């Protein structure tokens, strides 16, 4: 009896399985649930019209017509010239970049790895380094228009056998075809490349070296002002100056060396009286004799005070010392108080 029941059970299971197979074979045009048609795959869509994969945002960038037709007459086109439009567009670019950061930082990962491979930033005497990238481009006029890529490299270390630091800076410039960039070509056409190595010795002329035989040499004077900003930034970092908390003065020591100091250092140097720049009573007396009335003397003191302020603004150390010493010997107590109040305002309020 048990064998008979087992046989009947297996027979019924086999019968229903075949019945489902027979019913399904008649619907040849129906796609089995859970599979995806070839057309859907080619369109990148799932069966429920959802995306199979996340398309890269730059897959369908707009490619200018001038990249394909360099001779035809084109209708004039204009970007809206109101501030709100440009502000919103820059904001959209920033948001897109921040939300798809991994799509844009691959090159920086490679460059940082290259830097760290040659200069181990984990060494004990490593101080500071940076990799600064900038892309400059003007109006895209034709299929030969280019964009300029600038990469600045910097590194500094503490000397181990003597006092001081050692630093080096170089910049690489390359021109890339704008049409290739617009089409997101990995191997964009390079029209020119330049590598400049900056000497860190102020007394010497900058020397230039090339990366390979067909690299054009370029004089230091051709570097743009943005390179100067990177040098100023590196000087701030080297001197541990927080430019959000201190007013700073910048002095250009040479074409590639900038010295950054706190404003208070400038003022301390200005207001340090020595035998050479101390108050000269004879000079002051002669000046006052020319102004006999009280009104004339008052105007003279006001002029000194104005010149003193201007010398600070213009970073004129010689003029600052001269006018400060004259104020010290000519000003009344209230005017001296105004001087120090002015200095305090410069340091802590402006």
UniProtKB/Swiss-Prot annotation:
Gene Ontology, cellular component aspect: membrane
Annotated knockout phenotype: Formation of oocyst in Anopheles coluzzii mosquito midguts and development of salivary gland sporozoites are abolished. Transmission of parasites to mice following mosquito bite-back is abolished. Parasites exhibit normal development in mouse blood stages and normal gametocyte-to-ookinete transition.
Domain of life: Eukaryota
Keywords: Membrane, Signal, Transmembrane, Transmembrane helix
Residue intervals passing through the bilayer: 330-350
Keyword Cell wall biogenesis/degradation attached: no
Subcellular location: Membrane
Topology of this chain in the membrane: Single-pass membrane protein
Signal peptide interval: 1-24
Function: Involved in ookinete evasion of the mosquito complement-like response, oocyst maturation, sporozoite development and infectivity.
Assembly: Forms multimers, perhaps with an unknown protein(s).
Other observations noted: Addition of antibodies against PIMMS43 to the infectious blood meal significantly reduces transmission of malaria parasites by A.coluzzii mosquitoes.
Record protein name field: Ookinete surface protein PIMMS43
Organism: Plasmodium berghei (strain Anka)
């Amino acid at each position: 009896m048990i064998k008979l029941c087992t046989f009947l059970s297996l027979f019924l299971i086999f019968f229903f399985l075949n019945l489902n197979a027979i019913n399904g074979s008649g619907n040849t045009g129906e796609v089995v649930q859970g599979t995806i048609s070839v057309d859907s795959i080619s369109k990148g869509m799932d069966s429920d019209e959802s995306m199979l994969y996340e398309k890269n945002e730059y897959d369908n960038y707009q490619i200018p017509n001038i990249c394909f037709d360099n001779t035809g007459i084109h209708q004039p086109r204009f970007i809206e010239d109101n501030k709100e439009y440009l502000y919103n567009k820059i904001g959209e670019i920033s948001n897109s970049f921040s939300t798809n950061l991994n799509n844009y930082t691959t090159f920086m990962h490679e460059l940082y790895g290259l830097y760290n491979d040659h200069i181990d930033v984990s060494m004990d005497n490593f101080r500071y380094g940076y990799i600064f990238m900038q892309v400059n481009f003007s109006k895209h006029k034709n299929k030969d228009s280019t964009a300029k890529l600038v990469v600045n490299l910097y590194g500094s270390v503490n000397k181990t056998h003597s006092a001081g630091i050692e630093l080096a800076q170089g910049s690489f410039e390359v021109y890339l075809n704008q049409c290739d960039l617009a089409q997101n070509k990995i191997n964009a056409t390079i029209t020119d490349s330049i590598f400049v190595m900056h000497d860190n010795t102020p007394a010497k002329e900058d020397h230039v070296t090339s990366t390979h035989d067909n690299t054009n040499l370029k004089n230091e004077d051709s570097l743009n002002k943005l390179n100067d900003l990177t040098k100023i930034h590196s000087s701030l970092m080297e001197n541990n100056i927080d430019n959000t908390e201190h007013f700073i003065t910048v002095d250009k020591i040479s074409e590639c060396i900038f010295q950054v100091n706190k404003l208070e250092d400038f003022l301390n140097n200005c207001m340090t009286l020595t035998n050479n720049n101390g108050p000269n009573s004879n000079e002051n007396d002669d000046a006052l004799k020319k102004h006999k009335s009280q009104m004339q003397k008052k105007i003279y003191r006001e002029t000194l005070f104005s010149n003193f302020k201007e010398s600070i603004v213009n970073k004129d150390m010689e003029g600052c010392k001269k006018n400060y010493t004259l104020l010290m010997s000519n000003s009344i107590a209230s005017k001296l108080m105004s001087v120090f109040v002015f200095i305090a305002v410069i340091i802590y309020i402006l």
